[in-house]
Amino acid sequence: MKFERMDCGSVHNGPLAEGCKHCVEGGKMVLFITGRCDTGCYYCPVGLSKKGKDVIYANELCTRNKSEIIDEAESMDATGTGITGGDPLINVERTVNAIRMLKEHFGPEHHIHLYTSTMDMERISAVVEAGLDEIRFHPPLKQWAHMDETPLRDIVMNLSIDVGIEVPALPDHKEELDALVTFAESIGVDFINLNELEFSESNWDMMEKYDYDLVDELSSAVKGSGDVAHYIMKKHTNIPVHYCSSTFKDGVQLRNRLLRKANHSAKEYEVITDEGTEIGRAHV
């Protein structure tokens, strides 16, 4: 399996998940559907303004207005939506309604993927029936080496949409991550996404508690996370693995989304910067 290097240190050893292809191009709106989650991962990077709170964000816009969500997607000419949280399946009715709304407005080609820690087939079936195209499971760390005790095998067997695993590459849990990927490969999971572990305002205490350190003074990435991801990628060549660096998320995905929005909505008198911001054109 060929390794393909991308910008900002990201790399993958096989085809990218369809949802990732849209993200790389800046085409995915991020729909944060709720900050509520029952998993309680110590490394969760969700900001304090969202974590544990029942709030909705369409990209950077805090809203509960359906038309504003559609407007935000239209403003960036979105080709798809990534539904995240918290755990979107905590409020399955809201998530189902959002999927239906987006599909009805933009059509079946609008690609929707969702992140969840929930392995409840009834809730999963509800979002699939609403039009979900891709689901990414985030099992809690305590399950990584014991996935055969979870219902994931049966879930994968009974789903017709793309199924992936997306977790951070924890530098001190290489063996558990290896076990998780081995299990995923054995049951036919379509892809693995490994995110570089990052410090944020809500998980900063893990630096002292788990003896984590920064890659360097200019980065929020945790030292050793990338090394673990590369180890897993080299060992598991029969399943597509994508390592997404912290700098890739900001330097490529976010930048491309901002550029896409600026190009789609800028006025004739505005100039778009390389970072995707809009400034007024000076007249002499």
Language model feature labels by segment:
Residues S49-T63, M76-N91, H105-R123, V127-E149, ...:
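Core AdoMet radical
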Residues P45, T95-G107, V128, L152-L159, ...:
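Surface-exposed amphipathic alpha-helices with a cationic face
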Residues A282-V284:
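Conserved small/polar residues in nucleotide/adenosyl-binding loops
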Residues V96-E104, V189, S246-Y269:
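Short, electropositive alpha-helical surface patch
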